[in-house]
């Protein structure tokens, strides 16, 4: 799993936006991204673990919810070939930014 998390980190870096593992404190209004492991998502059959998985969340705080930032992240996630979905888009009044939140399932 560590090598797959490293691939995700490299993919997010390739978007051209700053991403940090588990987040950081930024000045209000500054665009940034974070990613972190959220939970296990194991595949189970006949009462046994068939494959171990991890759900990773990717968060991007941006001024533009539908343009280049979103497209850049989604292109990189698609290129990884793992299941993912855009889970929510919200306006964060305390930062003045739009918060995009993806869930990525990583197996193996």
Predicted segments — roles?
Residues 1-44, 65:
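Small/polar-rich, solvent-exposed N-terminal microdomains that initiate assembly or binding
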Residues 25-30, 58-74:
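Short secondary-structure transition/capping segments
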Residues 37, 52-56, 83:
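Generic signal for short, ordered secondary-structure residues
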Residues 52-64, 97-107:
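Oligomerization/assembly interface segments of phage tail-like spikes and tubes
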Residues 71-108:
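Acidic-leaning, charged glycine-interspersed low-complexity segments
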């Amino acid at each position: 799993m560590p090598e797959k998390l490293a691939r995700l980190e490299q993919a997010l870096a390739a978007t051209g936006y700053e991403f940090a593992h588990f987040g950081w404190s930024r000045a209000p209004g500054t665009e940034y991204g974070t990613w972190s492991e959220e939970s296990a998502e194991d595949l189970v059959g006949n009462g046994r673990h068939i494959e171990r998985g991890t759900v990773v969340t990717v968060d991007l705080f941006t001024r533009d919810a539908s343009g280049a930032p979103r497209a850049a992240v989604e292109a990189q996630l698609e290129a990884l070939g793992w299941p993912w979905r855009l889970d929510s888009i919200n306006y964060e009044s305390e930062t003045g930014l739009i918060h995009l939140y993806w869930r990525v399932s990583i197996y193996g």
